[in-house]
């Protein structure tokens, strides 16, 4: 989940034109999904040259008790949440957090239906030229907002992705195709690379690398339609390319135990893949030509 979400964020930056380290993220929810996404985002920001402490300052989380801050009177800041507790006065409501923090991206992963209200979406649109809105909770009934709400309220400005499938939305003559952050984009490629080159430790760096590989597969045509993920119809190619990229990464970082290292990684991967589709064995049929519905026999 974290890798898919971060891939979507990285692809979104191709639309917003804002460097990753200059973004501010607010999470609706501070459970395992949000913590995982935030952790990978911090790693990605550190790779751009800023310190881990500065990266964490750009990640804000809101749980059922409000903004996660140090010494919160209502408590509940324990475990992994402590890492993302900010030096800030307590704030109870998500909308007030967004007004104070002015994030460039909001990410929902707590299954709180309707959490991204019209006021929140309007605020995001007012504060950003291209606000990032990721409503990742599923099923659809638990989504923080629908694609239609996001595009309509932000007047087509937002970069939207969801955890549940939503139909295309037309606003002001332009049709947007919401991207779905489906885990199926990531785990087949990771599993394939892990098995084929015998990766014995799947580190957080492996997940971040898979996110970067996936983000790089989103072409300009997809971005122009609002998509931050490649079409699911290309899942075989996506999985193959992620596996190849991760195999290169694994050998470079001494994570692979399959030797000798394959010279042609693509040929190596494809040699272990199977095409499960069946060719038809039915005889070909043709329409009978007009005018030949009767046969004459002359002696």
Where are these regions (language model features)?
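N-terminal Rossmann-like NAD(P) cofactor-binding subdomain of oxidoreductases
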Residues: 70, 85-91, 109-114, 120, ...
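Adenosine-phosphate binding glycine-rich loop
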Residues: 12-16, 131, 135-262, 284-285
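Short, solvent-exposed amphipathic alpha-helical segments in soluble enzyme
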Residues: 42-44, 121-127, 148-153, 176
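N-terminal charge/polar-biased segments
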Residues: 168-169, 250-299
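Glycine-rich phosphate/diphosphate-binding loop of Rossmann-like nucleotide-binding domains
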Residues: 3-108, 257, 288
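Generic recognition of stable, solvent-exposed alpha-helical segments in well-folded globular domains
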Residues: 4, 32, 36, 101, ...
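A glycine-rich phosphate-binding loop feature that marks nucleotide/adenosyl-phosphate handling sites
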Residues: 24-31, 58-65, 226-234, 261-272
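Rossmann-fold NAD(P) dinucleotide-binding segment
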Residues: 93-103, 111-133
């Amino acid at each position: 989940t974290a890798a898919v979400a971060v891939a979507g964020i990285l692809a979104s930056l191709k639309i917003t034109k804002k460097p990753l380290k200059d973004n501010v993220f607010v999470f609706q929810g501070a459970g395992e999904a949000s913590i995982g996404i935030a952790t990978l985002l911090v790693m990605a920001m550190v790779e751009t040259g800023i310190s881990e402490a500065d990266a964490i300052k750009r990640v804000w989380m809101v749980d059922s008790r409000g903004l996660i801050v140090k010494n919160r009177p209502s408590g509940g800041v324990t475990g992994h949440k402590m890492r993302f507790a900010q030096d800030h006065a307590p704030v109870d409501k998500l909308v007030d957090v967004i007004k104070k923090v002015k994030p460039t991206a909001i990410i929902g992963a707590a299954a709180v239906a309707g959490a991204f209200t019209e006021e929140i979406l309007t605020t995001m649109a007012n504060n950003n030229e291209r606000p990032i809105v990721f409503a990742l909770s599923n099923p659809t009934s638990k989504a923080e907002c629908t694609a239609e709400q996001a595009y309509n309220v932000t007047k087509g400005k937002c970069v939207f992705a969801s955890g549940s499938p939503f139909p295309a939305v037309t606003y002001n003559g332009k049709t947007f195709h919401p991207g779905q952050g489906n885990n199926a984009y990531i785990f087949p490629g990771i599993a394939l690379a892990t098995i084929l080159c015998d990766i014995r430790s799947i580190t957080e760096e492996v997940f971040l690398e898979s996110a970067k590989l996936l983000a790089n597969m989103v072409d300009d045509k997809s971005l122009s339609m609002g998509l931050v993920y490649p079409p699911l119809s290309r899942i075989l190619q996506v999985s193959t390319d992620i596996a190849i990229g991760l195999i290169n990464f694994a050998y470079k970082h001494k994570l692979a135990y399959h030797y000798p290292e394959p010279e042609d990684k693509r040929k190596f991967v494809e040699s272990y893949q199977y095409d499960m589709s069946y060719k038809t064995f039915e005889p070909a049929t043709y329409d009978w030509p007009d005018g030949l519905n009767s046969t004459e026999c002359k002696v």
